[in-house]
């Protein structure tokens, strides 16, 4: 099992799909990496040599923000929105949908379990 960017890649999958197991790398960027390094998309992870795996890891480290660093950056971006106190930051702080979705009937995932308010 190849280990790239702190993630164990599944042995039997094709490399282009296995790289998507790394947080921050999708199918498009995985194909760009393989093209830049010169490895076939059809190759399986267990068929990779040590040199190929290290060249992939080197390319990812040079060009992409992945795993913990990317998660940290996303959290910092959200925190800065909340500190600024703009609309998106307030929505994050309140735990409501940020991108303009309606909240009258839906948004249960974001709002949590229904809190019934009794009336007299």
UniProtKB/Swiss-Prot annotation:
GO terms for molecular function: rRNA binding; structural constituent of ribosome; tRNA binding. PROSITE patterns: RIBOSOMAL_S13_1, RIBOSOMAL_S13_2. Residues 93-120 are annotated as: Disordered. Residues 107-120 have a biased composition (Basic residues). One of its GO terms (biological process) is translation. One of its GO terms (cellular component) is cytosol. Keywords: Ribonucleoprotein, Ribosomal protein, RNA-binding, rRNA-binding, tRNA-binding. InterPro entries: Rbsml_uS13_C, Ribosomal_uS13, Ribosomal_uS13-like_H2TH, Ribosomal_uS13_bac-type, Ribosomal_uS13_CS. Located at the top of the head of the 30S subunit, it contacts several helices of the 16S rRNA. In the 70S ribosome it contacts the 23S rRNA (bridge B1a) and protein L5 of the 50S subunit (bridge B1b), connecting the 2 subunits; these bridges are implicated in subunit movement. Contacts the tRNAs in the A and P-sites. NCBIfam families: uS13_bact. Belongs to the universal ribosomal protein uS13 family. Part of the 30S ribosomal subunit. Forms a loose heterodimer with protein S19. Forms two bridges to the 50S subunit in the 70S ribosome. This is Small ribosomal subunit protein uS13. It comes from Helicobacter acinonychis (strain Sheeba). The gene is rpsM.
